[in-house]
Amino acid sequence: MQAFTQHEGLVAPLDRENVDTDLIIPKQFLKSIKRAGFGPNLFDELRYLDHGEPGMDNSKRPLNPDFVLNQPRYQGASVLLARKNFGCGSSREHAPWALTQYGFRAIIAPSYADIFFNNSFKNGLLPIVLGELEVARLFDEVKAFPGFKLNIDLERQVVIAPDGRELGFDIEPFRKYCLLNGLDDIGLTLRQADKIRAFEAERLARHPWLESRPVA
């Protein structure tokens, strides 16, 4: 998992509440459990004018010119600004997969659905919670100033706006540690590899009959 320490990125505003996981990545794209290939279908129903299905050549599909991610000024955005209750609905982990594979490193919103919030951390996506008034102000600024960027300093737990104001946010220490060090569940387990091997060796020495052996 890619570590997250500090990130400056272009902001894209998704100005709607209660964005659910089926809108983030529609159900027909969930047949694969491989963590690859979901970015082109992020917000598929909003992004394209036709109905998307797995295997379609997205480069030939008609784009919705009114959707924020299709507008030239937001191309290359890596910070998503959203409204309250982002990520509600079913608990599909494909939602943060699609967001990160598109290129987003962080989301800023007043609130999130719990399962989406937890899944985001496990996949290197930083979900930042700011107050509704501050989020509303950011929406106004993003829309008013093309090229609007935010600097996110995870170590200091602040979002730095172009005018220099710093917006503090909370994060659990363990989640912060994992993001700073690029550790997902597998990475955390591998940090205990020596202890795991030592336990297995001791177990085998004490209970050798538990080890399966080929029949002669």
From Swiss-Prot:
Q: Which reaction does it catalyse?
A: (2R,3S)-3-isopropylmalate = (2S)-2-isopropylmalate
One GO biological process this protein is involved in is: L-leucine biosynthetic process
Q: What is its EC number?
A: 4.2.1.33
Q: Name the UniProt key words of this record, in alphabetical order.
A: Amino-acid biosynthesis, Branched-chain amino acid biosynthesis, Leucine biosynthesis, Lyase
Pathway(s) it belongs to: Amino-acid biosynthesis; L-leucine biosynthesis; L-leucine from 3-methyl-2-oxobutanoate: step 2/4
The UniProt record lists the keyword Ubl conjugation: no
Q: Name one GO molecular function term.
A: 3-isopropylmalate dehydratase activity
> Can the keyword rRNA processing be found in this entry's annotation?
no
Transmembrane parts of this sequence = none
Q: Name one Pfam family in it.
A: Aconitase_C
Check the record and name the InterPro entries matching this protein.
Answer: 3-IsopropMal_deHydase_ssu (IPR004431), Aconitase/3IPM_dehydase_swvl (IPR015928), AconitaseA/IPMdHydase_ssu_swvl (IPR000573), IPMI_Swivel (IPR033940), LeuD (IPR050075)
Instruction: Quote the cellular component terms of the Gene Ontology held in the record.
Output: 3-isopropylmalate dehydratase complex
What's the stated role of this polypeptide?
Answer: Catalyzes the isomerization between 2-isopropylmalate and 3-isopropylmalate, via the formation of 2-isopropylmaleate.
**Family as reported in the entry's similarity comment:** Belongs to the LeuD family. LeuD type 1 subfamily.
PANTHER family in the cross-refs: 3-ISOPROPYLMALATE DEHYDRATASE SMALL SUBUNIT, 3-ISOPROPYLMALATE DEHYDRATASE SMALL SUBUNIT 2-RELATED-RELATED
Describe the protein's quaternary organization and the partners it interacts with.
Heterodimer of LeuC and LeuD.
Name recorded for this polypeptide: 3-isopropylmalate dehydratase small subunit 1
Give the gene name: leuD1
